[in-house]
Each structure stands twice: as C-alpha cells, then as structure tokens.
C-alpha cells in the first residue's frame, strides 16, 4: 500500500492511498463482497460492527443510519459499472470540509480478481486520520477478500 501526503499546511493537503488486492474469487463474487463489506457488514478495524447503508446505483447514498432520521452521510455513488467499477465521492468520516473520491476498479486475472483501490482526498486532514486511514482501508479490504473467497464454489 502506498500513501502520499502533500501540501504546506493542514488546510491545503492532498492525500492519496492506493492498494492492489488479489482475490481468489470471480469478479461477481468479489464485487458482491465489496458492496456487502462497505455496507451492512462494515466493521471498525478492531472488529466492532459499524453497519452502513450503501445504495449501489448512480447517486446512491453511502451513510450510517442512527435511527430517528439521524446519521452520517459518507458519500454518494458517483459511478458504478457492475462488476468492474465502484466510485464514491463525499466527505467520508472527516468533518473538516475535506472531500474524498474512492475508486475500486476490478479486473479478471489468472486465479481470480484484482482490485485496484485508490482514495484521493483534498482538504484539511487531522493527524489522527492521517495515521489511521491506510490501516482502516486495509482492514476493510481484508474482509472483502475473506468473504469473497469463502463464498466461491468449490
């Protein structure tokens, strides 16, 4: 995984996180796992449930529903092309005015599926987020891989 942070101060930062994940499962199973793990099966890196709602369609919301019309909007589906592309745009988990773009590109490779992930962020990024973002994405991607590989037919 690579992480690049640039900008003279916290107000003008850009952050890019990239990761390639090889999954021993079909494109369809991997894409389905991605949607599920970003949605209702989402967890914190330490394994605590953090269920989200992901509406997998253009303009669909990705949010945390706290009940009673309360919650947190993390982003909107900018592009989706099943089973090879999911792109989300929004503030994600940062309430500082920063904006993010997440891109998942899936391709069929020998022995399964390759996921090319890229998180691009522009805006103020508090130090604790800089340190925890890459491990957070790695934890989600490990769950996507595990679930997709467990679901594949023998």
Where are these regions (language model features)?
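Hydrophobic ligand-binding cavity/cleft-lining segments
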Residues: 1-50
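A conserved amphipathic terminal alpha-helix motif
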Residues: 2, 121-154
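Structured surface interface patches that mediate subunit assembly and partner/cofactor docking
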Residues: 13, 43-49, 53-54, 138-143, ...
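A short small-residue
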Residues: 14-16, 117-124
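Conserved beta-strand segments that form the floor/walls of ligand-binding pockets within enzyme
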Residues: 16, 22, 87, 105, ...
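Hydrophobic pocket/interface hotspot
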Residues: 30-34, 62, 77, 88, ...
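Residues at helix-coil transition
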Residues: 35-39, 82, 142, 146-149
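Hydrophobic-ligand binding "helix-grip"
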Residues: 52-53, 58, 63, 67-110, ...
């Amino acid at each position: 995984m690579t992480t690049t942070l640039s900008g003279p101060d916290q107000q003008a930062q850009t952050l890019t996180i990239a990761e390639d994940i090889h999954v021993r499962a079909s494109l369809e199973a991997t894409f389905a796992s991605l949607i599920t793990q970003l949605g209702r099966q989402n967890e914190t890196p330490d394994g605590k449930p953090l269920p989200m709602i992901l509406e997998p369609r253009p303009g669909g919301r990705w949010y945390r529903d706290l009940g009673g019309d309360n919650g947190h909007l993390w982003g909107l589906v900018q592009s989706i092309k099943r089973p090879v592309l999911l792109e989300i745009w929004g503030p994600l988990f940062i309430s500082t005015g920063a904006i993010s773009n997440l891109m998942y590109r899936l391709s069929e490779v020998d022995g399964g599926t390759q996921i090319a992930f890229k998180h691009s962020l522009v805006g103020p990024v508090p130090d604790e987020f800089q340190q925890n973002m890459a491990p957070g994405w790695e934890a989600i991607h490990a769950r996507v891989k595990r679930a997709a590989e467990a679901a594949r037919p023998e």
